[in-house]
């Protein structure tokens, strides 16, 4: 985290938001729950060491609508300023599967899995869980076999718009995620077309995330993301740390 703060200052960022994962289903070997106390201590150390950098303390709740008690426990444990809600897993044959699992997204199943994923995101949006930002709305696109089957967002427009309408109704912020830098084929998560649908459905605010996971990737792809979001009808606020608005 300290290396990330140093990198933020090197590239001229006025602020950085740490949004550590709090996932409640162990789908990867060696996966552990979030040590909230240890995380908050690390944030405090960074704030003391880098007073010139605004450091926002956040958390990304994975499928909190399926694990409401565990999610509430995380949020009650300390001072969380920014709460993201996300979906990584879908239920297949009675068990949760993360779409990042190698081979899960095959050319035989992508459309069905994509719809299954978006249906779970809609469940999250409707859940009433206390998250402010909807993170990487179409996380599944990261694992779509783009080299074998082009992803046409228009084929899923109905599912996308149902999520966006519900998110707008509850006042949610839509995150545009660059996945550590915009890869030309995969693109943004979600892409400009979906961000425009967000605007059309009444969405008010947009945030940016690089999902960096390492210091060298923070803010990667933000210039391209900002251009796409601006083209969709959203504008930056005077405060560079604030959400963009319509």
Annotate the PLM regions.
Residues 1-68, 81, 143-154, 214-220, ...:
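An N-terminally biased module of ancient metal coordination in phosphate/nucleic-acid-related enzymes
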Residues 1, 24-25, 30, 78, ...:
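Divalent metal-binding pocket/active-site signature
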Residues 9-10, 40-52, 71-84, 126-129, ...:
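Acidic (Asp/Glu)-rich catalytic clusters
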Residues 16-18, 55-59, 83-85, 133-135, ...:
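Hydrophobic faces of well-ordered beta-strands that scaffold small-molecule active sites
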Residues 69-71, 121:
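Glycine-rich, charged/polar anion/phosphate-binding loops
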Residues 16, 44-46, 84-87, 110-115, ...:
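Short, surface-exposed, polar/charged, turn-prone segments marking secondary-structure boundaries
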Residues 1, 92, 147-246:
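Charged catalytic cores and adjacent phosphate/nucleic-acid-binding surfaces used
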């Amino acid at each position: 985290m300290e290396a990330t703060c140093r990198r933020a200052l090197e590239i001229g960022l006025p602020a950085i938001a740490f949004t550590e994962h709090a996932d409640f289903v162990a789908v990867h070997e060696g996966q552990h729950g979030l040590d909230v106390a240890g995380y908050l201590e690390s944030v405090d150390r960074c704030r003391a060491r880098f007073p010139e950098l605004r450091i926002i303390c956040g958390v990304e709740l994975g499928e909190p609508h399926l694990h409401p008690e565990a999610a509430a426990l995380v949020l009650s444990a300390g001072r969380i300023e920014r709460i993201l809600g996300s979906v990584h897993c879908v239920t297949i044959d009675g068990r949760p599967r993360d779409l990042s699992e190698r081979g899960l997204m095959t050319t035989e199943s992508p459309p069905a899995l994509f719809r299954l994923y978006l249906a779970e995101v809609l469940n999250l949006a409707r859940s009433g869980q206390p998250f402010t930002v909807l993170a990487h709305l179409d996380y599944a696109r990261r694992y779509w076999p783009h080299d074998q089957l082009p992803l046409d967002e228009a084929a899923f427009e109905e599912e996308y718009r149902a999520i966006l309408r519900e998110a707008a109704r509850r006042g949610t912020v839509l995150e545009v995620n660059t996945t550590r830098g915009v890869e030309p084929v995969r693109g943004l998560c979600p892409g400009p077309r979906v961000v425009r649908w967000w605007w059309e459905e009444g969405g008010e605010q947009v945030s940016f995330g690089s999902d960096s996971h390492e210091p060298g990737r923070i803010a990667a792809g933000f210039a391209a993301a900002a251009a796409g979001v601006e083209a969709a009808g959203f504008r930056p606020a005077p405060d560079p740390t604030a959400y963009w608005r319509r």
